Every structure is written in structure tokens, then in C-alpha cells.
Amino acid sequence: MSNKMWGGRFGEGPDRIMEEINASIGFDQRFFAQDIRGSKAHCRMLAEKGIISSEDAAQIVAGLDVVLAEIENGTFHFKRELEDIHMNVESRLADLIGAAAGRLHTARSRNDQVATDFKLYIRDTIDHLDEQLADFQRALVDRAEEHAATIMPGFTHLQTAQPVTFGHHCLAYAEMAGRDRGRLADARRRLNESPLGAAALAGTSFPIDRHMTAAELGFDGPTRNSLDSVSDRDFVLETLSAAAIAATHLSRLAEEIVIWSTPGFDFVRLTDGFTTGSSIMPQKRNPDAAELVRAKSGRVIGDLTSLLIVMKGLPLAYSKDMQEDKEAAFDALDALSLSLAAMTGMVRTLTVNETAMRNAASRGFSTATDLADWLVRALGLPFRQAHHATGALVAKAEKKGTDLDGLTLAEMQEVEPGITDEVYSVLGVDNSVASRTSFGGTAPDNIRAAVRRWRDELGS
């Protein structure tokens, strides 16, 4: 029995194992909307150029509308023996309209067809992710406005460093999400060239109009080299790279939420909706949503790495290896989308323990830098000398079992005789935070101004 798709070249059908390893319909069926959209554009162009009749084109477009409706309402039957979404759609089209369906593939290969489908899919997905990232930013900005003056410890090395505000911390992640949106927008701009009409690899002898199909599909224009058109997966790699960075940002916040939820910190409390219990320990409230966001970032990074490895040794133009691009992309982008939804929900609904945050900020000598700065401003000491004196005062306070403001003036003057009682005005966390007025600093007024800028930018 000859193969139905490849015609007379083959005397018998594929081995069962070959059919199984070769089939992609189990995952590329999610291209159905993009595949049908691309086929309609190609069909209309063929008719416009006189390559097929307008009557055949009308039948094809009407038949594709029926196929689309069947897939959307769940009555379409996908067949593994037809390999992929392209042949499943074409086969059903032939059932519906007969021989005219065979004219659709004129001047087209599955190589340029799948590249077109994939670009349309990635473009649609980028648009969806951008909306999710913007919603995530809005959630962060809302919490930043609410907690513009809520003092918490800022950390380096997960050790108390300087007091900051929780609003400032939230806006740090809004900045990260903004860069993520920028990277995805850059990827979208670069991918927005249509490979349709490149055919298998060398172009076609039919008088097609690639500019027409590119315009109908919303591309900026056609790709300029047919070999590159069908072998390019940079647009997937670039999108997955941006996705991996975004997932890494979410993972960092997830890690902080996990830490902050522990009794040792007690900075935040997730709602019951984003936690789980234990089958044996009745007291447990586990931050599983945050932990899963943290874990899914590893999957996204792994999917990017997987696709890079698939592509690294492929000669031009198309190789079947490239069928392995889709599952990695689907998995990564699905994981990022779900992680964004979960993280946005957690940010919107978590409860902030302002007392615990403030108490933690007041411990660990978090105003030591403020003391050093005061020594520079009030006494004219070089910063390095002020830094050394402050370190000695920290050691003295640590030995005494108190914070810096627990040292007496006499004890401070043992280290630096010029210190006056004015020093106590800079040792409180409120004054410390309020003094950080440099652009981008943590002062509450800065945070409120930043919130206004973000609301203008996000339209909220």
C-alpha cells in the first residue's frame, strides 16, 4: 500500500513504530486556529493571482470554516495516521468539498506552513503573556501604594542590611516585569515576518504574492530568504529565553514568599486558597503555590536548553528534529502563564504582618549605614573612617546585647569623641527610610511618586 501523503514514491505504508514516532498531532493540534487562518490567506492569494479558480477558493474557505467550527465544538476527530494538524485539516477538508481541497497546497510546503503556524501562535501567546505581566504589575503597584510606608528589613546575603519599605520591594518586581514585557515585545517585533510562500526551501515557480499573505496575516512583510524561512526557530528560542528570565523573576519572589511565610519571619500569610495542608500534620499550612512557581521556573529554563540543543547541529534547511520544538515551547509558555496567574493571585491576596516586618527591620543594626553617613555629614569624617568607627560601635552594641540606639552617648564617645546626642535622630528605622530620598530610593514619598508613574504607564 503506497503512502497517501507521499504518493507513488513509496510502495508501502510506514511501520507502526515509524507512525508513532513521526506523529505530532498529539501536540501540534493546538495550532488549529493558526493553521486554518494561514490556509485561508494562502487560498485567497492563490485565487487573486489566478493560480486557482475563485470557485475553488470559495469552496475551500467555506470548508475551512466548517473544519474550524468542528474543532472548536469538539466534534472533529484527529487521526494519528495523518501525522499532524496540517494533514488532518486537509483530509477533513477533502471529505467536505472533494477534489478542490487538493488545490489548497499549491505553492506551499508543510515546511513554510508550520513555520507560519508557529509564528502566529508565538505572536498570539506573547500578546497574552504581556497582558498577564501587566496584570501582575498592577497587583504589585496596588500593594506598593498600600504599603508605601510599611517598614521592613532590606537584605543582602539574606542578612539584614538597611530598612526599606514593602512598597519599595513590590515595585522592584514591577520593574523586573517591565523588562520582561520589553524582551517579549522585542521578540515579537523580530518574529513578525511571514515565512508563508517559502515552500519547502527554495521558493516556488508559481507567481504568488507573499506580500499579500503577509499583510493579511498581520505580518510586517515576508521573510527575505526561503532557506532561512523554513529553518529559522530563533523566534521560539528568543521567546523562551524571555520566558525563562520572567520565570526566574517569579521564582525569586516565590522564594521570598516561602521564606517570609515561615514562623521565623512571619512577614506574610497566604490565603487558604494558595496553600495546602498535610495528610498527617494537622497544623500545617504549606505555601505550595509559591513552591510550584519556584519549581516551574526550572522547567521553563530546561525547555529553553532542550530546544537550543535540538537546534545546535542542524544543517539547512528543514530537518525532522525541528518537530521537537513544539512540546518544549508549549510546556514553557504554559508554565509561565500558569505561574503568572498564581503569583498575581498571591500578591493580591496575601496578608502583610506590618508589626513583624517593622520589628525585624529594627534588629540587626539595620541603621548602621545611617550612623556612618551621620559621622560624615556632622563630623566631617572621611567615609572610610566613619565606616570603621561605625563597625566598632556595632561590635560594642553586640557585646552589650543591644542595638545601636541602646548605647549611651558616653559609650559612643569612647569610639568617636565627637559624637553628640544628635546621633540618636538617625538611628530609628523611620528616619532612616524617610532620608532615602535619592531617585529610586525607598523613602515613602518616593514610593508614592513611583506608584503614580506606574499607574500612568499601566493605564490604571
UniProtKB/Swiss-Prot annotation:
HAMAP family: Arg_succ_lyase (MF_00006)
Pathway: Amino-acid biosynthesis; L-arginine biosynthesis; L-arginine from L-ornithine and carbamoyl phosphate: step 3/3
Leading EC class: lyase
Species of the source: Parvibaculum lavamentivorans (strain DS-1 / DSM 13023 / NCIMB 13966)
Catalytic activity field: 2-(N(omega)-L-arginino)succinate = fumarate + L-arginine
Main localization category: cytoplasm
Localisation per UniProt entry: Cytoplasm
EC number of this enzyme: 4.3.2.1
Membership in a protein family: Belongs to the lyase 1 family. Argininosuccinate lyase subfamily.
The name this protein goes by in its record: Argininosuccinate lyase
SUPFAM superfamilies linked: L-aspartase-like
Keyword Transcription: no
Molecular-function annotations in GO: argininosuccinate lyase activity
Name of the encoding gene: argH
InterPro entries: Arg_succ_lyase_C, Argininosuccinate_lyase, Fumarase/histidase_N, Fumarate_lyase_CS, Fumarate_lyase_fam, Fumarate_lyase_N, L-Aspartase-like
Pfam families, A to Z: ASL_C2, Lyase_1
Annotated GO biological process: arginine biosynthetic process via ornithine; L-arginine biosynthetic process
Keywords of the record: Amino-acid biosynthesis, Arginine biosynthesis, Cytoplasm, Lyase
Example of a GO cellular component annotation carried by this entry: cytosol
Domain of life: Bacteria
